[in-house]
Curated annotation (Swiss-Prot):
Cross-referenced HAMAP family: Ribosomal_bS16 (MF_00385)
This protein's name: Small ribosomal subunit protein bS16
Gene3D superfamilies per the UniProt record, alphabetical: 3.30.1320.10
Pfam families, sorted: Ribosomal_S16 (PF00886)
Family the UniProt entry places it in: Belongs to the bacterial ribosomal protein bS16 family.
Gene designation: rpsP
Length: 157
């Protein structure tokens, strides 16, 4: 039986996701698989490629032939170089950036909400500012009157 390592398409119309599978070469693209070796998501940035290297090495060792798209993926992950004994077995796969947890995102949004604008009316702040200015003016007037009273008492003596 001729065995191929190929892609099985999943996903919606414009959002394809693929499984990397081992299947009989005569089965259709989305037919029955012998084994699932990994996934490939081309729409993510950078593309997500997760392939079980040990199982790929096994299937290549027993004679499974990769299709052209799968061969390109195996070269990116370094599995093809490892199988052939070529240099560059580490591959050129880019690491996925770490996603922030939902709890961290929630806490950041909560902190922004606490520091952001409040639901209080703006006019109350204006009134409070006027009131503070009036109180400061009243304190200054009292201080001036006290200074004048002291000056009068000293001059009367």
């Amino acid at each position: 039986m001729a065995v191929k390592i190929k892609l099985q398409r999943l996903g919606k119309i414009r959002t394809p996701h693929y499984r990397v599978i081992v299947a009989d070469s005569r089965t259709r693209r989305s037919g029955r698989a012998i084994e699932n070796l990994g996934i490939y998501e081309p729409k993510a940035d950078p593309s997500v490629i997760r392939i079980d290297s040990d199982r790929v090495q096994y299937w290549l060792g027993v004679g499974a032939q990769p299709t052209e798209p799968v061969l390109a993926l195996l070269k990116v992950t370094g599995d093809w170089q490892k199988f052939k004994g070529l240099p560059g077995a580490e591959g050129t796969l880019k690491a996925q950036p770490e996603k922030k947890s939902k709890l961290d995102l929630f806490n950041e949004a909560l902190a922004e909400a606490n520091n952001g604008p409040t639901l209080e009316a703006i006019t109350e702040k204006r009134k409070a500012a006027k009131k503070a200015a009036e109180e400061a003016a009243a304190k200054e007037a009292e201080a001036e009157e006290a200074a004048e009273d002291k000056a009068e008492e000293e001059s009367a003596e």
